[in-house]
Amino acid sequence: MGMGMMEVHLISGKGLQAHDPLNKPIDPYAEINFKGQERMSKVAKNAGPNPLWDEKFKFLAEYPGSGGDFHILFKVMDHDAIDGDDYIGDVKIDVKNLLAEGVRKGKSEMPPRMYHVLAHKIHFKGEIEVGVSFKLQGGGGCGGCYPWEN
């Protein structure tokens, strides 16, 4: 079993589609979840369908660990201060092989690529560009595994 730090790089979005009855530019952001650890990107104010986030998020990851679900879940939203935020769609990225390789080799990486944003698992709502890396922590501890330690 190995424990380490997984870094998720949320780079950009392309062609994001949200229903806005006033036809104003969307303000997209993403809620990111890995095994109960939640992070939120900044709101790309007036970015429209092609936001640039370029943000990195750190998650404590253990492999094989408990539970068999090794997915990063992205919930892409349109911020709306007046009517409440609107759901755009979801992305689910399987990182089981990334973590397994990282435990074997000490580190591993999934280079940035585009992932389809799907509403209700079937309706295409654009894409987000994401890269993921994992670094195994040595010595049985996990120094630096918590975002507030960096």
UniProtKB/Swiss-Prot annotation:
Please give the InterPro entries that the UniProt record associates with this protein: C2_dom, C2_domain_sf
Q: Keywords assigned by UniProt?
A: Calcium, Metal-binding, RNA-binding, Transport
Gene3D superfamilies the UniProt entry points to: C2 domain
Report the superkingdom from the record: Eukaryota
Quote the tissue specificity entry. Sieve elements of leaves, stems, roots and flowers.
Keyword RNA-binding part of the UniProt annotation: yes
The molecular function terms in GO held by this entry are: metal ion binding; RNA binding
Which residues take part in binding Ca(2+) 1?
D20, D27, D78, D80
Residue span(s) of domain C2: 1-108
Question: Which residues does the record give as Ca(2+) 2 binding sites?
Answer: D20, D78, D80, D86
Q: What Pfam families does the entry give? A: C2
Q: What cofactor is needed?
A: Ca(2+)
* Protein task: Binds to both sense and antisense RNA. Interacts with mesophyll plasmodesmata to mediate its own cell-to-cell transport and potentiate RNA trafficking.
Q: Please identify the protein, giving its name as recorded.
A: 16 kDa phloem protein 1
In its UniProt entry, the species of origin is given as Cucurbita maxima (Pumpkin)
Q: State the gene name recorded for this protein.
A: PP16-1
